[in-house]
Amino acid sequence: MGRSPCCEKAHMNKGAWTKEEDQRLIDYIRNHGEGSWRSLPKSVGLLRCGKSCRLRWINYLRPDLKRGNFTDGEEQIIVKLHSLFGNKWSLIAGKLPGRTDNEIKNYWNTHIKRKLLNRGIDPKTHGSIIEPKTTSFHPRNEDLKSTFPGSVKLKMETSCENCASTSGTTTDEDLRLSVDCDYRYDHLDKELNLDLTLGYSPTRFVGVGSCY
């Protein structure tokens, strides 16, 4: 069998508290102390739920409540306690005399959370927020040049060395190798879209057994 409700809600006032109701609640708690919230409304003569009386006292009427803005010291305590307890506002309020759990929760959501985000701190984990790394696209020819500097030059020079005749005499084979060297040079230029005029000039057969 479940727990019975603390009051008959059909006959309860649900609007704003009046000054007379506040004073009745204050006088009763001063004389009898806090507690027994379920039976309190009937004892005081209030058409209010026991939970409503408790929240009214804790959040608005108790004499030790602090009014006004949170101090820097209180804010630091809230941040530290939140890193330990998370959103357990009642535990945090227990360490801050005069502040209510509802008041602390509202201040966290409207002020502190935004401040932490502006400082690059995750309000949930209290760790640094890591920005995702962005990847940029590089064309294939630029990627080759940056990854293997000088590789294009090495390929050119190797091709030219193969053009040189070991006999020292211009032969049909020399001419064929020279044409082949020019073809590979131009073909590599088109493939990588490189400007070969920067530092290198197109290969031409100039002298006997030489390729420049």
UniProtKB/Swiss-Prot annotation:
Identification of the protein by name: Transcription factor MYB8
Source organism: Arabidopsis thaliana (Mouse-ear cress)
Single Gene Ontology MF annotation: DNA binding
UniProt superkingdom: Eukaryota
Main location group: nucleus
DNA-binding region: 37-61, 89-112
Gene3D superfamilies recorded: Homeodomain-like
Localization in the cell: Nucleus
InterPro entries: Homeodomain-like_sf, Myb_dom, Myb_TF_plants, SANT/Myb
